[in-house]
């Protein structure tokens, strides 16, 4: 790790100094009259400087990744406590109400393209460095190539989930002239490219590094398999939704996405196997906390090698009306790089690399926090069962109105998300919901940001099983229920008891299991930048509608999926907004963000009033030039 941070903090500054004097175009990271000299690529240190630069650049986009992947979802409301320190309150409220337009700077995707260009630099110059540096081996280059190919694919994957059709290039961009050559590439076409790219390098990255922070903070084989599972899950949804025309019955299996759903199961298991091996190789003495109990909560036979952090003392602490120990919360969020982690962006107080206070910018109950938690959505996810809501430890830190903490100005008791705060949970007296004592000290600004972890992959597999179901209560339905219950049990105070399950014997149909997966993902990943993406995928899988897609007339516009997603999830606690959301989103294009107006300007026009890179047809409210 010392070598990593030496390169990270010294070489990276040199790379940044060379490359970040950018012109104002969204893909250009070098000034027009200056590109990196060919002599820059002398040895592996030059490659590694650019390699770590890509990770840093992606980490600097964290606020946008949260807005794109989470903000619009059913998990949040604008903070009920209005404060002048909430500088983005008006903007975020517009986004929550689906009032998107191309002048919102949060939809500027340029920073992600900069990370992509760093990846392209590494991939384009690796062979040259290999030829020049005798100490740099072919094996090391192949591992780095696999890692950076996956990182580039992850960046593009964020973009197609956020904007649908995007500009795609696997070449280094160095000038404005090259920008003018770009036209949009369709979402599904880009996804096909990404899957093929990652398929070509799977299993070729490193399994682990000497330091656990590198193992969890750089892309390894377990992260690559998780990424493949995620991309196949999305492609299965896109294919299924485009095969659905008119009115859609989710109880009826649509086989268009079945092959990809099976791939989710294959690569999900591969990711979990790789994580299991990785953790064995690391060992408790080399980075992981000792004294943890790991359980599979009934997964074996459906998914193998599952090791979830158990909260064994939670039930006894709760019954004794005392401070409740929640090791899963402590290890996954407060400490980071847990045994369940597959890939997380690293932030470190010792290296002065913070997350910019982004997590407290969105969550918590301080004066600067912009969001409250939508308790109605969480209650529905718990089966409208208040007892389950109170006894699921995840609600204690993602949707709690019984709290006390530093920085809180609340005089009432709205619900907030404290996932990224330092929390202590105290069950006292007759209070059924433990009181959360939270703090946002300096360490919070240096907590890692999790991209993939074990329960994420497990619930991808549960969704894939639901997709593959062809009859009520078949083996796939039973497998999906087993996985959902395993994830749920870990966080319920009863743990292995019968009351800890969330599914019921009556949950036998494909559409019901897809709904249950979405509910469990809300409970598990609220505040982790995933919820809106999940809802988009759900809507895309349904598709349907009576009108043609505005950009692809061979398929319908997906409006039925949009409407069902709003009715089933977004409406919880927001019934007054339902008709407005449906009117504003219109069709599947309304699920995605607008193209930032300066990026359209950079691409120019093909004729008066016609941009080379057209605006999202739902958010077609642009400044004109």
Show the residue positions of the predicted features:
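C-terminal motif of bacterial Sec signal peptides marking the signal peptidase cleavage site
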Residues: 19-22
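Bacterial signal peptide processing site
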Residues: 24-27
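Short coil/linker segments at helix-helix boundaries
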Residues: 165-187, 238-266
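Elongated scaffold/linker segments in the mid-to-C-terminal portions of large proteins
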Residues: 42-46, 51, 55, 59-62, ...
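Extended amphipathic alpha-helical segments enriched in small hydrophobics
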Residues: 152-153, 228-229, 446-494
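Conserved, well-structured interaction surfaces
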Residues: 44-61, 66, 83-163, 178-216, ...
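Bacterial N-terminal signal peptides that target proteins for export
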Residues: 2-11
């Amino acid at each position: 790790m010392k070598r990593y941070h030496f390169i990270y903090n010294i070489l990276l500054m040199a790379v940044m100094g060379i490359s970040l004097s950018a012109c104002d175009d969204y893909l250009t990271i070098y000034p027009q009259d200056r590109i990196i000299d060919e002599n820059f690529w002398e040895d592996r240190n030059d490659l590694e400087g650019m390699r770590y630069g890509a990770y840093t650049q992606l980490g600097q986009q964290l606020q946008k990744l949260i807005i794109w992947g989470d903000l619009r979802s059913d998990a949040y409301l604008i903070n009920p406590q209005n404060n002048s320190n909430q500088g983005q309150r008006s903007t975020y409220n517009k986004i929550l109400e689906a009032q998107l337009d191309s002048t919102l700077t949060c939809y500027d995707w340029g920073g992600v393209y900069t990370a992509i260009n760093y990846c392209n630099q590494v991939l384009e110059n690796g062979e040259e460095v290999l030829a020049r540096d005798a100490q740099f081996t072919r094996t090391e280059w192949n591992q780095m190539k696999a890692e950076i190919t996956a990182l580039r694919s992850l960046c593009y994957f964020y973009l197609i989930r956020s904007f649908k059709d995007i500009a795609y290039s696997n070449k280094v961009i160095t000038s404005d002239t090259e920008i003018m050559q770009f036209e949009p590439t369709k979402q599904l076409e880009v996804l096909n490219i990404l899957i093929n790219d990652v398929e070509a390098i799977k299993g070729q990255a490193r399994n682990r590094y000497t330091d656990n922070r590198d193992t969890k903070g750089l892309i390894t084989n377990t992260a690559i398999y998780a990424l493949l599972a995620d991309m196949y899950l999305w492609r299965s949804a896109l294919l299924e939704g485009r095969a659905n025309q008119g009115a859609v019955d989710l109880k009826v299996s649509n086989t268009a996405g079945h092959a990809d759903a099976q791939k989710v199961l294959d690569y999900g298991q591969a990711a979990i196997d790789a994580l299991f091996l990785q953790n064995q190789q690391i060992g408790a003495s080399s980075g992981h906390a000792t004294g943890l109990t790991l359980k599979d909560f009934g997964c074996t036979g459906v998914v193998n090698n599952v090791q979830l952090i158990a909260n064994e003392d939670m039930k006894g602490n709760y019954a004794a009306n005392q401070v409740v120990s929640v090791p899963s919360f402590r290890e996954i969020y407060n400490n980071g790089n847990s045994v369940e982690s597959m890939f997380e962006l690293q932030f470190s107080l010792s290296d002065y690399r913070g997350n910019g206070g982004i997590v407290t910018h969105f969550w918590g109950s301080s004066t600067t926090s912009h969001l409250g938690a939508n308790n109605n959505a969480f209650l529905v996810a718990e089966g409208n069962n208040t007892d389950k809501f109170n006894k699921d430890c995840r609600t204690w830190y993602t949707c709690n109105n019984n709290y006390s903490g530093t920085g809180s100005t609340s005089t009432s008791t709205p619900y907030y998300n404290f996932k990224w705060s330092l929390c202590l949970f105290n069950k006292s007296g007759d209070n059924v919901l433990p009181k959360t004592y939270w703090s946002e000290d300096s360490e919070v600004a240096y907590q890692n940001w999790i991209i993939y972890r074990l329960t994420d992959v497990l619930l991808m597999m549960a969704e894939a099983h639901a997709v593959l179901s062809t009859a009520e209560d078949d083996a796939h339905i039973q497998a999906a229920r087993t996985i959902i219950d395993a994830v749920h049990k870990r966080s319920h105070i009863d743990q292995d008891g019968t009351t800890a399950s969330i599914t019921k014997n009556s949950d036998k149909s494909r559409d019901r299991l897809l709904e249950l997966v979405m509910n469990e993902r809300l409970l598990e990943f609220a505040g982790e930048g995933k919820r809106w993406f999940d809802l988009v995928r759900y809507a895309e899988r349904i598709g349907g509608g009576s009108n043609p897609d505005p950009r692809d007339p061979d398929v319908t516009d997906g409006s039925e999926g949009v409407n069902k997603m709003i009715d089933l999830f977004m409406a919880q606690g927001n019934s007054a907004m339902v008709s407005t959301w449906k009117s504003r989103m219109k069709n599947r294009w309304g699920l995605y963000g607008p193209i930032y107006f300066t990026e359209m300007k950079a691409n120019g026009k093909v004729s008066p009033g016609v941009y080379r890179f057209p605006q999202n047809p739902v958010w077609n409210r642009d400044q004109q030039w």
